[in-house]
Regions:
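Amphipathic alpha-helical dimerization/coiled-coil segments
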Residues: 78-117
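N-terminal helix-turn-helix DNA-binding core of bacterial DNA-binding proteins
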Residues: 2-35
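Helix-turn-helix/winged-helix DNA-binding modules
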Residues: 20-22, 75, 86
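Residue-level signal for threonine
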Residues: 4, 63, 106
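Residues within the alpha-helical elements of helix-turn-helix
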Residues: 32, 69, 86
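A short, conserved structural fragment
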Residues: 48-58
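Basic, amphipathic "hinge/linker" alpha-helix immediately C-terminal to the N-terminal HTH DNA-binding motif
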Residues: 58-76
Length: 117
């Protein structure tokens, strides 16, 4: 199953939170993304059934498959945010727009763009 943008955002948020604090709970993801805990529960069920995350009693972990996608999304996010900030875009706008940009390019286009810059 191909991930939607929202699924990629959930994986990326778990990755970022796990790097910051180690253990990641559903409530942490909800607060990070600004969504309800019910939304996180639904998304986690879908991501777990597709092999991207494993749910523990109190926490959530990325599988190897989920970690691969999350790292890729975070790498793209950082690239686009940095590019926009270097162009003079405010940090807040760069973060919001970088989040959208990270999802819309193919791997080939992203690699070519990154190599060019």
């Amino acid at each position: 199953m191909a991930l939607r943008e929202s699924g990629e955002d959930y994986l990326e948020s778990i990755y970022v939170l796990s790097e910051r604090q180690g253990i990641v709970r559903s409530i942490d993801v909800a607060e990070y993304l600004g969504v309800t805990k019910a939304s996180v529960s639904k998304a986690m069920a879908t991501l777990e059934s597709n092999g991207y995350v494993e749910m523990g009693k109190r926490d959530v972990h990325l599988t190897e498959r989920g970690l691969e996608v999350a790292r890729q999304m975070w790498e793209r996010h950082c690239f686009f945010v940095g590019l926009l900030e270097d162009a003079g875009v405010s940090a807040e706008v760069a973060s919001q727009e970088g989040c959208h940009m990270e999802h819309c390019l193919s791997e080939e286009s992203f690699e070519k763009l990154r190599a060019m810059l």
